[in-house]
């Protein structure tokens, strides 16, 4: 692109031409210095052959703010210079020819307060199907404090949840009921009881268990809460079960949540696929009713997994913290689901830190101040077992829920034994860590020593000790070493 093609055309000349390049319409400004109140989006773009990357970046800025395909005279009726998003930086993606990181700044006035639906309608509403781009991915986003303060965030938060459960200094343990579909209400409740009695803190509905012919939702809630109450009485610990209230309408979701509350549940669950407005609505209900809100990220892989097109999960995690969830499935790194260890740690940092620093290896391109918004408790779930306890504790620390579904329900000695194996493995590993031992390297030895006194743990290690899912992650962090928010 020549210099003239990058220079904004102003005044009457602007409105004589029917079609101008986006850079000429003012959507590119290489000298722009983002304001503290600007929202900044980092896109990975793959322009079509022959499309200049600066023009492609300007097109992204234009189509995600005020532009259309031609000049419109009604621009003159607005403060268009303020309302236009501004692409201000383009960097080649290291080691990936034809792809570029482009930085786009948006004035805060473009967005409705406290609405993820409005934010996403602008940022991702149109540009991802734009013909001049082969592909586009939203890699990261800096949310200005003034905008963050318009959201209420998680209804409970990590600190209050731990106080309610009276459990501190170690990860929480959970399991997803298996098989996820097909059990009767009574058998489902028995699985819940066995897991909780064996030592777990939580049991969980899976993403697609709602109200099917084989088990009506009311039956499941009744049997599950009977199991929770019985296990709590037997163990003397506060227990819970994530009751999935996901349904076809908000009215039905509220109906189910109210019934869960009447039964004494401390937590309800929704799936990501219900949409942003529904998520924020359920978060507000939980805030008003002192309930913990668990978020299952069902469906996220359809747009987060591929590196060249879609949305990074770190951005989804940021939006969900704003929207207000207390728990969020954020990957395991060592389990069966996609996840590079450093990238997954970046997701956890988004959930748990009060201020994120720039951390390029973990995919965090911007500083992010969360303005006292409560923390989200990440959940590690999917293909993990007791033999990986040292890796999980070393990677993620204490503030995490470790959920062993198959690693509990599939134990050769039964469900309760599976839960006990996980509890003993965790307690042994936390004790070793607190004594100053190097659990990352001594973990297998520590587990085997504990297994001498715990037959369920011994059986778990014999069954799964060598099981791992060693695949090359598709989503790893690419970065330019000099990248900063400016």
From Swiss-Prot:
The modification N6-carboxylysine is found at residue 204. The basic functional RuBisCO is composed of a large chain homodimer in a 'head-to-tail' conformation. In form I RuBisCO this homodimer is arranged in a barrel-like tetramer with the small subunits forming a tetrameric 'cap' on each end of the 'barrel'. GO terms for molecular function: magnesium ion binding; monooxygenase activity; ribulose-bisphosphate carboxylase activity. Mg(2+) binds at residues 204, 206-207. SUPFAM superfamilies: RuBisCo, C-terminal domain, RuBisCO, large subunit, small (N-terminal) domain. This is Ribulose bisphosphate carboxylase large chain. Heterohexadecamer of 8 large chains and 8 small chains. Its EC number is 4.1.1.39. The gene is cbbL. The keyword Magnesium applies. InterPro entries: RuBisCO (IPR033966), RuBisCo_large_chain_AS (IPR020878), RuBisCO_lsu_C (IPR000685), RuBisCO_lsu_C_sf (IPR036376), RuBisCO_lsu_fd_N (IPR017443), RuBisCO_lsu_N_sf (IPR036422), RuBisCO_lsuI (IPR020888). CDD domains: RuBisCO_large_I. It comes from the Bacteria. RuBisCO catalyzes two reactions: the carboxylation of D-ribulose 1,5-bisphosphate, the primary event in carbon dioxide fixation, as well as the oxidative fragmentation of the pentose substrate. Both reactions occur simultaneously and in competition at the same active site. Keywords: Calvin cycle, Carbon dioxide fixation, Lyase, Magnesium, Metal-binding, Monooxygenase, Oxidoreductase, Plasmid. It catalyses: 2 (2R)-3-phosphoglycerate + 2 H(+) = D-ribulose 1,5-bisphosphate + CO2 + H2O; D-ribulose 1,5-bisphosphate + O2 = 2-phosphoglycolate + (2R)-3-phosphoglycerate + 2 H(+). Substrate binds at residues 126, 176, 180, 297, 329, 381. Belongs to the RuBisCO large chain family. Type I subfamily. Binds 1 Mg(2+) ion per subunit. The record marks 336 as: Transition state stabilizer. The active site is at residues 178, 296. Pfam families: RuBisCO_large, RuBisCO_large_N. Its cofactor is Mg(2+). GO terms for biological process: reductive pentose-phosphate cycle.
